[in-house]
From Swiss-Prot:
Native organism: Gracilaria tenuistipitata var. liui (Red alga)
UniProt KW Membrane keyword: yes
UniProt name for this protein: Photosystem I reaction center subunit XII
HAMAP family xref list: PSI_PsaM (MF_00828)
Family: Belongs to the PsaM family.
GO cellular component: chloroplast thylakoid membrane; photosystem I
Length: 30
């Protein structure tokens, strides 16, 4: 059983990792 807090944490973690991946990608691209 997945609770709402676990879904919120998973979404927040995915958002942070996506932002870090984009920033790292742009740094390597330039």
């Amino acid at each position: 059983m997945i609770s709402d807090s676990q879904i919120f944490v998973a979404l927040l973690f995915a958002l942070v990792s996506a932002v870090l991946a984009i920033r790292l990608g742009t740094d390597l691209y330039q």
